[in-house]
Regions:
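Extracellular and select intracellular beta-sandwich modules with Ser/Thr-enriched
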Residues: 123-126
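Interdomain boundary/hinge segments at the C-termini of tandem beta-sandwich modules
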Residues: 129-131
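Edge beta-strand plus adjacent loop/short-helix module at the start
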Residues: 1-104, 117
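Short, surface-exposed ligand- or partner-binding patches at beta-edge/loop junctions that are enriched
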Residues: 106-119
Length: 132
């Protein structure tokens, strides 16, 4: 066994809840293709958010500049022994994660989130996130 503070995330105050719909066939997130001029998520440093990620097909999902624990996969709570910090998760159908924002970013140096599959990322399955 190893020591981690990941378990404490389950008791965190949730600043916001967001839902993301991944259309794997068309490379879209929430029916939108990546636009480098559009900020998709604005979050605050030091907060925790619940992200619910639904996918049309199994796909990897990653977040830059933040870490998270998986709360549930396909509506089944994750066992306490599986709680660990992650930056990428495999989404079969639905994943619920608790995202902790500790690193700031800006309009000139934003973070990206979205598909960890590079072909899907090239199709536009990415979003821009600013953390301040």
């Amino acid at each position: 066994s190893f020591n981690t503070d990941a378990m404490a995330m389950l008791k965190s105050k949730i600043a916001q809840e967001r839902t993301f719909e991944l259309d794997v066939t068309n490379g879209l997130i929430n029916k939108q293709r990546f636009d480098p001029r559009r900020v998709d998520v604005s979050a605050k440093v030091g907060t925790v958010e619940r992200w619910i990620i639904n996918s049309s097909l199994p796909v990897g999902f990653t977040i830059q500049g933040a870490k998270f624990v998986i709360e549930s996969q396909d509506d089944v709570n994750v066992d306490a022994s599986e709680l660990a910090w992650k930056d990428t998760v495999w989404v079969k159908k639905k994943v619920q994660i608790l995202v902790k924002f500790e690193q700031p970013s800006s309009n000139t140096h934003p973070f990206l989130f979205g598909s960890s599959n590079l072909m899907l990322a090239d199709m536009g399955s990415l979003g821009i996130m600013i953390v301040q």
